[in-house]
UniProtKB/Swiss-Prot annotation:
Involved in phosphonate degradation. Functions as a lyase that catalyzes an elimination reaction on the naturally occurring compound (R)-1-hydroxy-2-aminoethylphosphonate ((R)-HAEP), releasing ammonia and generating phosphonoacetaldehyde (PAA), which can be then hydrolyzed by PhnX, encoded by an adjacent gene. Thus, catalyzes a reaction that serves to funnel (R)-HAEP into the hydrolytic pathway for aminoethylphosphonate (AEP, the most common biogenic phosphonate) degradation, expanding the scope and the usefulness of the pathway itself. Its cofactor is pyridoxal 5'-phosphate. It comes from Vibrio splendidus (strain 12B01). The modification N6-(pyridoxal phosphate)lysine is found at residue 317. This is (R)-1-hydroxy-2-aminoethylphosphonate ammonia-lyase.
Length: 479
């Protein structure tokens, strides 16, 4: 095969790492099925006015409304949103958040730099309270990518080292500094030289990792994604120390506590070893909890499920309650040493509206006991998905935490060959039946519902999903 022919194949593989590919024949067939004239007209207007980019063009459908766990298109069709770009922890249009933001807009809609305001201070105080431990210093920013940049700056300042270790297949945002430390080729494609001093190591992947697991997966149960004490993946952490010692000058290690897109859940032992290594070598541990924070794991923040504390925590997306973009970097008082450095300096740094939304989000999670609810829902989802795994041979692995689950489809359980076509077929079958989710790595179905979802809604969604899996198994002759 020539290099020319290889390039499209490589690009398709790269783009599958983050989400479902929107230029496949299956997507074209889906777009053709949208036979509403108003929908097609809107899609054309969108295509004519916006810059086209990978994974966003062409659009899947048009939306006119969103409420609770549902998004609604121009024809009135509703989708249960199990994707939501991870801003939908509390679903859409939560009345408490709308009320608090509306009140804030009427009194103080914006706070210029050099001034502070009661809402921002209250929000920061509440945030440090739920973080607990030594995470007691906060900076706000308009979005998650921005706080990643702030964290990298702070780590350089504190350690006086500019080098960073990250994980292959990681995603930390789409700005130049964020794609520099990210591990997905699709975002670096054609961008030329990026930020210097980035080393990458393999992530602790339980099902098809770069290194074999040292202990039998049976020790971790049928679900390869239990956040437990099993030490079968600790050698992935040991490789971090190898790189730190060989490379030298490492200032930070950045990672998600749980990889969001294809739901990779390391063991507690892995994260405890990472924490030990960072402490030993004076490397700052940056946890990117932008997609999973605010309760998705069943804890306020995902690292809390692993009994560790980072030096810097980055959050965003769902922090604004699905209403207002806001993100935060939380760190320790001992790192409050950058008074002469502009770590953020963002126009909307102490946004009263953003902080009102974030404060209301934290209040809803507490008032509605969503952390406890997520833990109960997690056990239910695990049981249902494991039953499907036993029945349908296309399912190779089930892994998850809280209300974040990955279902990996394979054509063969021995070779673990990725079932690309089958995963796409499941996606569009579910979309037809009103269930929306993303597909990562080309074959991992990510199920990420709003935390407010009722048990009945959860049962309906899983029923739709199972019927799609059953149909694909029949159509592709697995059964």
């Amino acid at each position: 095969m020539t290099t020319t022919n290889q390039e499209p194949i490589l690009k398709a593989t790269h783009f599958r790492s983050e989400g479902d590919v929107n230029t496949t024949p299956a997507r074209e067939k889906w777009n053709e099925s949208l036979n509403d004239d108003a929908t097609q007209a809107m899609l054309k207007r969108d295509s004519d006015v916006f810059l086209h980019q990978a994974m966003s063009t062409p659009c899947l459908d048009t939306l006119t409304a969103a409420e609770g766990i549902y998004i609604q298109d121009a024809t009135g069709k509703k989708y249960m949103d199990f994707h939501g770009n991870n801003v939908h922890q509390l679903g859409y249009g939560h009345p408490h958040i709308i009320n608090k933001v509306t009140q804030q807009m009427a009194s103080l809609p914006f706070s210029p730099r050099r001034f502070t305001n009661e809402t921002a201070v209250q929000c920061a105080e509440k945030l440090t309270q739920i973080c607990g431990g030594d995470l007691n210093r906060v900076l706000f920013a308009p979005g998650g990518t921005s706080v990643i940049g702030m964290a990298l700056k702070l780590a350089r300042h504190v350690t006086n080292n500019f080098k960073v270790v990250s994980l292959w297949d990681s995603f930390h945002g789409a700005s130049l500094d964020a794609i520099s430390v990210g591990g997905e080729a699709c975002f670096r494609e054609g961008m030329g030289p990026l930020m210097a001093g980035v080393e990458r190591i393999p992530p602790a992947v339980s099902y098809r990792g770069a290194f074999p697991l040292r202990d039998s997966l049976s020790l971790r149960g049928q679900n390869s994604g239990d956040a437990n004490e099993t030490a079968c993946d600790v050698h992935y952490a040991d490789y971090l120390e190898y790189v730190i010692e060989k490379e030298g000058g490492i200032g930070a290690f950045i990672a998600e506590a749980v990889r969001n897109t294809d739901v990779q859940v390391p063991s507690k032992a892995y994260w405890k070893r990472i924490r030990e290594i960072c402490d030993k070598h004076n490397v700052m541990l940056i946890i990117d909890d932008i997609p999973n924070g605010m309760g998705r794991s069943g804890e306020w923040f995902t690292h809390q499920a692993f009994d560790i504390e980072p030096d810097i925590l980055c959050i965003g997306k769902g922090f604004g309650g699905g209403l207002v973009p806001i993100a935060a970097m939380i760190t320790k008082d001992k790192y409050n040493t950058a008074a002469q450095v502009s770590l953020g300096h963002y126009t909307h740094e102490k946004s009263p509206i953003g902080c009102a939304a974030a404060l209301a989000t934290m209040e809803v999670i507490e008032q509605e006991n969503l952390l406890e609810k997520v833990q109960a829902d997690s056990a239910f989802v695990r049981e249902q998905l494991l039953q499907m795994k036993e029945e349908y041979p296309v399912i190779g692995d089930i892994r998850g935490i809280g209300l974040l689950w990955g279902v990996e489809l394979v054509t063969d359980h021995i070779t673990k060959t990725r079932a690309f076509d089958e995963a796409e077929a499941v996606l569009y079958q579910c979309l037809n039946e009103g269930l929306s989710f993303k597909v990562s790595q080309g074959n991992v179905i990510q199920l990420s519902p709003p935390l407010i979802i009722s048990r009945n809604e959860l049962e309906v969604a899983l029923s739709v999903f199972e019927k799609a899996i059953a149909k694909v198994c029949k159509d592709f002759e697995y059964l």
